Amino acid sequence: MGITALAFDFGTKSIGCAIGQSITGTAQALPAFKAQDGIPNWEAIEKCLKEWKPDVVIVGLPLNMDGTEQDLTLRARKFANRLQGRFGVNVHLQDERLTTTQARSEIFERGGFKALKKGKIDGVSACLILESWFEYAEY
């Protein structure tokens, strides 16, 4: 039986989102959530969770290239804890190193500079985070 997973690419201004299935190991970008200093519209997040009913939620963990934590790492952990606390969802953290760089590269290849919109980058980053989790997680 497959697992439905929802992924978030946490950011202080925008939070990317993607939905995916473990059977295919693929993800599809959803519209990004606007955030103010890392605080999302929690009603919009709740609506998304109710609509998609994920078995698990994945939050990208921003780490430095050497694996050490950075300022945004703590904020992403806090976001993950709030998701779990507010909505009772099963949350996992996934290393997201280089996902934004890879997302920009993929979007640029498809549509050039005009395609490089922040919300689109965040959504593709969330897809990459989720697909990485499908590949490496033991569920």
Curated annotation (Swiss-Prot):
| Keyword NADP attributed | no
A GO molecular function for this record? nuclease activity
- Annotated GO biological process: rRNA 5'-end processing
**One Pfam short name:** RuvX
Could you say which EC number(s) this protein's record lists? 3.1.-.-
Null mutant phenotype = Controversial; it has been found to be non-essential. Has also been found to be essential.
Transmembrane spans:
none
Q: Which keywords has UniProt assigned to this entry? A: Cytoplasm, Hydrolase, Nuclease, Ribosome biogenesis
Subcellular localization, as worded in the UniProt entry: Cytoplasm
Could you give one GO CC term from the UniProt record?
A: cytoplasm
The protein's matches in Gene3D superfamilies, at most eight in alphabetical order, are given as: YqgF/RNase H-like domain
Keyword Cell cycle, does the record have it? no
Give the matching NCBIfam families.
RNAse_H_YqgF (TIGR00250)
Q: Fetch the PANTHER family from UniProt.
A: POLYNUCLEOTIDYL TRANSFERASE, RIBONUCLEASE H-LIKE SUPERFAMILY PROTEIN
* Family to which this protein belongs: Belongs to the YqgF nuclease family.
Q: What does this protein do?
A: Could be a nuclease involved in processing of the 5'-end of pre-16S rRNA.
HAMAP family under this entry? Nuclease_YqgF (MF_00651)
Protein name, UniProt field? Putative pre-16S rRNA nuclease
Question: What organism does the record attribute this protein to?
Answer: Haemophilus influenzae (strain ATCC 51907 / DSM 11121 / KW20 / Rd)
